[in-house]
């Protein structure tokens, strides 16, 4: 296997091992988990087992006929919200990935309908679960075998209209939850941070969603939303930092991906390792997906989270409790390390990670790498020019993953330690592009110009 180097990488940065000093000054880097565990999350003592993921998938299937009725764009798929697993040979070549390093595929959540991002998975699931609970409690659904299309009828909408669903968001989660909640008739409120893009706020308002703007960052928007919800017994707050329902909604993507891999003839085993690169904000989406994949593939899947260099909250949480960060307590933020949480990747601009997601993935997460904004725009432009993928900056964080794994000393040491070096030619690399479908044309054009200028 040859070492590869991303078009965005700098040799001096790529050759070094992880260091806290490099993290604190915002250098792009790779951190490999020191002890990936063979004790994977489907053990009897785990609070989240594969049966929970199966039940989540069953719930999404029960709602599919209703979703097909509510959203014409879902009719062809029978109400199932899913993205394609796409070959990307031109992008692989542009990323300097020779054939002996494996095959690159793109999980195209940037094109997911309704929300246009990965947040359609977890966010919509939690809204549907809450609607199901209310409908069962009030006798609108006799059982899980009922026809869920009754939830589009006036009686159900009258019930839902007396209840509120709220969320704190930098943008995409708010879009997913706001659009779905409003479509069912709920009062929908989205608390948005200063990082949120104006077009996302306008898209919500046009769908009847109340947008509450906050001057602070993501964490402050979530805290404000949580406090407001606690004062209203009829308000269900979708808590991105603590929600098991969200996490399971994301985890339900794993069995679907497994079926797509089988359909494409891609094996995953000791001789055919699977590497997955997932953009990470608070951690719920990549955490849920990593959980689901680990339940299916065990030690043969290697999930790496991607974060902005100035907002690496999940990596900071992974380092919590180490001697270097022990003085910061159990739940440190990027501010504690002197970082400013400023990035064009609005969906990843999070100062403090979800403790729930961190503890779920800690036993099996392969690693975390960081990417600067310049590289995000460069890779966004590369995805467009090679494959025609229309992604937003946050989604582009997944694309430097192979280079960070195979082109850094830290990444190569991980491959050597896990005895993967001689299996790379038969490996599969999945870059999970997390959003972009609904980015306005003028905004996307600016992204492309900035990416072209840095290429």
UniProtKB/Swiss-Prot annotation:
Keywords: Lyase, Plasmid, Pyridoxal phosphate. The keyword Glycoprotein does not apply. GO terms for molecular function: D-serine ammonia-lyase activity; hydro-lyase activity; pyridoxal phosphate binding. The keyword NAD does not apply. It catalyses: D-serine = pyruvate + NH4(+). It is an enzyme of class 4 (lyase). Gene3D superfamilies: 3.40.50.1100. InterPro entries: D_Ser_am_lyase (IPR011780), Ser/Thr_Dehydratase (IPR050147), TrpB-like_PALP (IPR001926), TrpB-like_PALP_sf (IPR036052). The modification N6-(pyridoxal phosphate)lysine is found at residue 119. Signal peptide: none annotated. Its cofactor is pyridoxal 5'-phosphate. GO terms for biological process: D-serine catabolic process; isoleucine biosynthetic process. Its EC number is 4.3.1.18. Belongs to the serine/threonine dehydratase family. DsdA subfamily. NCBIfam families: D_Ser_am_lyase (TIGR02035), PRK02991.1 (NF002823). PANTHER family: D-SERINE DEHYDRATASE, THREONINE DEHYDRATASE, MITOCHONDRIAL-RELATED. This is Probable D-serine dehydratase. It comes from Polaromonas naphthalenivorans (strain CJ2).
């Amino acid at each position: 296997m040859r070492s590869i180097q991303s078009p965005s990488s700098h040799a001096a940065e790529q050759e070094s091992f992880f260091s806290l000093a490099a993290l604190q000054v915002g250098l792009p880097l790779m951190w490999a988990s020191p002890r990936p565990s063979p004790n994977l999350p489907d053990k009897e003592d785990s609070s989240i087992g594969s049966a929970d993921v199966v039940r989540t998938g069953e719930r999404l299937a029960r709602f599919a006929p209703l979703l097909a009725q509510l959203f014409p764009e879902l009719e062809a798929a029978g109400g199932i919200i899913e993205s394609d697993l796409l070959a990307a040979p031109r992008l692989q070549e542009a990323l300097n990935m020779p054939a002996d390093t494996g095959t690159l595929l793109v999980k195209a959540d940037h094109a997911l309908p309704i929300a246009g991002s990965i947040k359609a998975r977890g966010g919509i699931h939690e809204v549907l679960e809450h609607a199901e609970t209310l409908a069962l409690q009030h006798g609108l659904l006799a059982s899980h075998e009922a026809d869920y299309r009754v939830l589009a009828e006036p009686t159900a909408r009258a019930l839902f209209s007396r209840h509120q669903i709220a969320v704190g968001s930098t943008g995409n989660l708010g879009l997913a939850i706001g659009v779905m909640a409003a479509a069912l008739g709920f009062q929908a409120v989205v608390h948005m941070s200063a990082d949120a893009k104006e077009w996302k706020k306008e898209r919500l308002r046009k769908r009847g969603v109340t947008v509450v703007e906050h001057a602070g960052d993501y964490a402050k928007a979530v805290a404000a939303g949580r406090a407001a919800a606690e004062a209203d017994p009829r308000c269900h707050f979708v808590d991105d930092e603590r929600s098991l329902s969200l996490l399971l909604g994301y985890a339900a993507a794993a069995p679907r991906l497994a079926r797509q891999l089988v359909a494409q003839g891609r094996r995953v085993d000791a001789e055919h390792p699977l590497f997955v690169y997932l953009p990470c904000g608070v951690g719920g989406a990549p955490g849920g997906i990593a959980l689901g994949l680990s339940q299916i593939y065990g030690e043969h899947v290697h999930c790496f989270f991607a974060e902005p260099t100035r907002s690496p909250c999940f990596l900071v949480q992974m380092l919590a409790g180490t001697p270097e960060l022990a003085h910061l307590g159990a739940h440190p933020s990027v501010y504690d390390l002197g970082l400013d949480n400023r990035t064009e990747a609005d969906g990843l601009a999070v100062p403090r990670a979800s403790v729930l997601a961190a503890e779920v993935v800690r036993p099996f997460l392969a690693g975390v790498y960081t990417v600067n904004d310049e590289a995000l725009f460069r890779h966004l432009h590369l995805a467009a020019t090679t494959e025609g993928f229309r992604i937003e900056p946050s989604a582009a964080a997944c694309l430097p993953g192979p280079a960070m794994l195979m082109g850094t000393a830290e990444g190569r040491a991980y491959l050597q330690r896990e005895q993967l070096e001689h299996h790379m030619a038969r490996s599969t690399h999945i870059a999970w592009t997390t959003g972009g479908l609904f980015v306005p044309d003028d905004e996307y054009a600016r992204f492309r110009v900035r990416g072209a200028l840095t290429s």
